[in-house]
Every structure is written in structure tokens, then in C-alpha cells.
């Protein structure tokens, strides 16, 4: 079955009672101010159809969803052996900001979707781009077709003001020789990436290339190779939802990437992208109502990679 607006609206009505059962990300003060009753979903098909319901056009801080976009840029710039020498491809089973595993594994992060891995990727982009912050924003605007996407400076500054743990992660990796640049400028770029302000509609369009073998559906532009698209989807399926990745694969059955702003992007390879947003999170840091909405949609339209 194809997704329809009615299906999306019905699903949002079914998951709305979950609002009030999760927690917004209060460790980033600027995110704690977001109204917890927001709920939106957008589906973007490979033939260019956009189907939405709820607050699908309202922008929010995408946070760790940006890690998949930064990884895409890094895969364009670096040979595989260079990239995967510095960051792994395995699930961590730990909290996304854990230091324990990083110490035990000699400063090489398990995957690019935990904080340590994304900070390594940010360091790699910093080494190759004279202005990585501007390059990422340009890339996202091109993919989404929306020139009005911006960084939320309030969120970025809030994260910078509470950066002790991420700075510790970066300095620990530096002590093992897995960091090339000064820590704080790299972290500033990393926090700006997390602060990208986008809607479900923006996200669904932006990630279209991962549902279309590396080609952006609307423009037919080559972004990455089919092999690279497969690899990013595989990492999203195994590592994209922190230590809740297995639960998400079991319930939803799609590659996905979440952020503590309450957004999740999910991919149905060869068919569509799905973006959901609900700010309240489960204990793993994933959107509570958003995950349930994706599970219901997977069941209703009969889509899963498994």
C-alpha cells in the first residue's frame, strides 16, 4: 500500500497519547524550551511526491541527524581506508556520549553516529574545508532545495556553553593521536551542524539520495555512489539510533537516524524517505512518539528492509 495523507493523519492521532510520557532533551538548555506537544511527519517518494501531516513544516534542531550528512561529505573527500582507519563501523551498545568504550579502544570510535565518531568526522572535514560550516550548510540547502535553512545560533551557543563532555571526548581521542586540529574550533563546527534548523519536509527531501542509490530524486543529481549509499544505509540500520538501534530495527525495520531534538529520518531504499518529529524522547534519546509512528507506518504500508 502507498502512504496517503489519511494514513499519516490517522497514525499521528494514534500516537498523540504518548505525548507526556517522554522527556525533552534538557541537558541542552535551548532544546528544553521546545513545546513538547509538537508532532509531524513527511513522506517523500522517489517520484517526487511529498505527503505530510501535523507539524511537518515546522523547523526544529536536527541534532545528530546531521551526522549522516557530515559522513556523506567525508565519504566524498576521503578514501575508504583513510576514513575507516579513524572511525569504526560497529554498533556501540553504549550511550551516545560515552567515554568508557573510547578509552578501551585506543581512541577510535565505534561508529560515525555516536558523538565521538561524529567529532572525528568533523575533524576530518575541518582538515579539508577552509570553511566546513559554510560547506555543510551549502550542501544541505542544495539537497533540500531550500535556501532558507539556517543554523540556530542559540542552540549552537547553548551546546558550546555545555561542551565539557564532548570536549573530553575530543581531547581523549587527541591523546591517542586520532585528532588533527585544535579541539574547540572543530567542536564549534560540530555544534553548528547539530543546530541545523529544518522541518520534516526539509529532512525528507534532503535524504532522498539515500533512497535512490545516491542520486537526488528531484534534481537527478549524483551525490554519492550506489555503494556509498548502501554503506550509509547499512550504518544507519545498525548504529543510527544510539543504543536503541536494535529495538528500532525490530520495530520499524528501516535504516534510520535520530537526533535529540526529536527528529528521526528513515529510509525505504528504492522508494521513499520518511521524516518524523516529536520532541519527547525515550531513555535512549530517540523520539518516543516518532518511533511509534514509524512502526505503525511500516505496518500499514508493508515496508521494511527485512
From Swiss-Prot:
Chain segments annotated as coiled-coil in the UniProt record: none
Pfam families: Glutaminase
Keywords: Hydrolase
Biological process per Gene Ontology, one example term: glutamine catabolic process
Quaternary structure annotation from Swiss-Prot or TrEMBL: Homotetramer.
Sequence similarity: Belongs to the glutaminase family.
Name of the protein in question: Glutaminase
Lineage, opening ranks: Bacteria, Pseudomonadati, Pseudomonadota, Gammaproteobacteria, Vibrionales
Amino acid at each position: 500500500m502507498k502512504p496517503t495523507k489519511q494514513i499519516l493523519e490517522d497514525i499521528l492521532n494514534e500516537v498523540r497519547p504518548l505525548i507526556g510520557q517522554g522527556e525533552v532533551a534538557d541537558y541542552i538548555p535551548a532544546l528544553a524550551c521546545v513545546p513538547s506537544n509538537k508532532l509531524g511527519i513527511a513522506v517523500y517518494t522517489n517520484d517526487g511526491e511529498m505527503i505530510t501531516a501535523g507539524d511537518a513544516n515546522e523547523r526544529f534542531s536536527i541534532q545528530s541527524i546531521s551526522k549522516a550528512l557530515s559522513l556523506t561529505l567525508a565519504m566524498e573527500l576521503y578514501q575508504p581506508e583513510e576514513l575507516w582507519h579513524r572511525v569504526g563501523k560497529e554498533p556501540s551498545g553504549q550511550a551516545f556520549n560515552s567515554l568508557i568504550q573510547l578509552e578501551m579502544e585506543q581512541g577510535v570510535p565505534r561508529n560515525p553516529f555516536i558523538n565521538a565518531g561524529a567529532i572525528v568526522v568533523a575533524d576530518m572535514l575541518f582538515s579539508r574545508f577552509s570553511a566546513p560550516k559554510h560547506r555543510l550548510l551549502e550542501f544541505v540547502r542544495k539537497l533540500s532545495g531550500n535556501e532558507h535553512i539556517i543554523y540556530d545560533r542559540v542552540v549552537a551557543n547553548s551546546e558550546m556553553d555545555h561542551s565539557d563532555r564532548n570536549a573530553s571526548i575530543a581531547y581523549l581521542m587527541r591523546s591517542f593521536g586520532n585528532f588533527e586540529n585544535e579541539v574547540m574550533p572543530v567542536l564549534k563546527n560540530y555544534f553548528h551542524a547539530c543546530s541545523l534548523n529544518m522541518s520534516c519536509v526539509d529532512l525528507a527531501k534532503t535524504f532522498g539520495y539515500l533512497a535512490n542509490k545516491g542520486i537526488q530524486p528531484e534534481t537527478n543529481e549524483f551525490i554519492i555512489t550506489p555503494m556509498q549509499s548502501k554503506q550509509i544505509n547499512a550504518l544507519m540500520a545498525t548504529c543510527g539510533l544510539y543504543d536503541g538501534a536494535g529495538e528500532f530495527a525490530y520495530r520499524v525495520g528501516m535504516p534510520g537516524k535520530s537526533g535529540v531534538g526529536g527528529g528521526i529520518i528513515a529510509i525505504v531504499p528504492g522508494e521513499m524517505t520518511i521524516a518524523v518529529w516529536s520532541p519527547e524522547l525515550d531513555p535512549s534519546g530517540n523520539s518516543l512518539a516518532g518511533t511509534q509512528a514509524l512502526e505503525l507506518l511500516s505496518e500499514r504500508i508493508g515496508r521494511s528492509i527485512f
